[in-house]
Swiss-Prot record:
Disulfide bonds join 83-112, 248-261. Residues 1-22 form the signal peptide. Under normal conditions, liver-specific. Gene3D superfamilies: Gamma Fibrinogen, chain A, domain 1. NCBIfam families: GGGWT_bact. This is Fibrinogen-like protein 1. GO terms for biological process: adaptive immune response; blood coagulation; hepatocyte proliferation; negative regulation of T cell activation; regulation of immune response. Homodimer. Interacts (via the Fibrinogen C-terminal domain) with LAG3 (via Ig-like domains 1 and 2). It comes from Homo sapiens (Human). It is found in: Secreted. Induction: Expression is induced by interleukin-6 (IL6). Up-regulated in a number of cancers, such as lung cancer, prostate cancer, melanoma and colorectal cancer. It holds the Pfam family Fibrinogen_C. The lineage of its organism: Eukaryota, Metazoa, Chordata, Craniata, Vertebrata. Residues 74-306 form the Fibrinogen C-terminal domain.
Length: 312
């Protein structure tokens, strides 16, 4: 009887040992499977991010060569008042988009600079002299230029500037570069352009930056009365609203907010750096390079004063 009992104990012990071993193996297998699941979940999340990026890029019908289908098509999701709204809706790729400011009767194309903090609506660009900026009132009112190429030159249009800057308070940032690979910027709070009845009058607020305050003419008190562009009306060769006995726009071959005549003219004639001419009609920012140096590139862009980027 004792032998039988011993045999049963041994058999039971062996059986329990095998079951414990099997349970341990099962636990290890479960841990291995959980680790694999976590790894797969991580990979799925990474793929989801990549898919989202690809889908957004897939929406882009943007050809650097200048095809007419260069506007990033966001479909009929919503209408955007400016580029800051597009940026905060998750579109972080710079390029041409359609916007419709609140008072604008129709949408129009504009280049959105999604770098430099994002959400910048580009209102003017000079890059290579390929576009003629010596134009009349209607052209400057409606806008003109290359709205298809990434670095194309254009003026967004005074009507559009008015529609944009009346919907809220905007900051104007001007990026400048010379032919010696140097760059500067000027920034103005509360940039606003009046309506047609007020001849698209310019209003600017507080300055900050590295290029000097050429728009307000604050570089010397004795010249501010004729050099400042603050509250100046827009002028073109065929619509003269400056404070000069002649016609600044005609002499300087561009449309601008001339006084008598300027300490800044970013729509001037494109020269390669230092130049000589009958008048100081180059692309001028006096407080950086004076009147007789024409800049290589200019970007004028605006964004709401209270813009807070959506990082998601």
């Amino acid at each position: 009887m004792a032998k039988v009992f011993s045999f049963i104990l041994v058999t039971t012990a062996l059986t329990m040992g095998r079951e414990i071993s099997a349970l341990e193996d099962c636990a290890q297998e479960q841990m291995r499977l959980r680790a694999q699941v976590r790894l797969l979940e991580t990979r799925v999340k990474q793929q989801q991010v990549k898919i989202k990026q690809l889908l957004q890029e897939n929406e882009v019908q943007f050809l650097d060569k200048g095809d007419e289908n260069t506007v990033i098509d966001l479909g009929s999701k919503r209408q955007y008042a400016d580029c800051s709204e597009i940026f905060n809706d998750g579109y972080k790729l710079s390029g041409f988009y359609k916007i419709k400011p609140l008072q604008s009767p129709a949408e129009f194309s504009v280049y959105c600079d999604m770098s430099d903090g994002g959400g910048w609506t580009v209102i003017q660009r000079r890059s290579d002299g390929s576009e003629n900026f010596n134009r009349g009132w209607k052209d400057y009112e409606n806008g003109f230029g290359n709205f298809v190429q990434k670095h194309g030159e254009y003026w967004l249009g005074n009507k559009n500037l008015h529609f944009l800057t009346t919907q809220e308070d905007y900051t104007l940032k001007i990026d400048l570069a010379d032919f010696e690979k140097n760059s500067r910027y000027a920034q103005y709070k509360n940039f606003k352009v009046g309506d047609e009845k007020n001849f698209y009058e310019l209003n600017i607020g507080e300055y900050s930056g590295t290029a000097g305050d050429s728009l307000a003419g604050n570089f010397h008190p004795e010249v501010q009365w004729w050099a400042s562009h603050q509250r100046m009306k827009f002028s073109t060769w065929d619509r003269d609203h400056d404070n000069y006995e002649g016609n600044c726009a005609e002499e300087d071959q561009s449309g601008w907010w001339f006084n008598r005549c300027h300490s800044a003219n970013l729509n001037g004639v494109y020269y390669s750096g230092p130049y000589t001419a009958k008048t100081d009609n180059g692309i001028v920012w006096y407080t950086w390079h004076g009147w007789w140096y024409s800049l290589k590139s200019v970007v004028m862009k605006i964004r709401p004063n209270d813009f807070i980027p959506n990082v998601i």
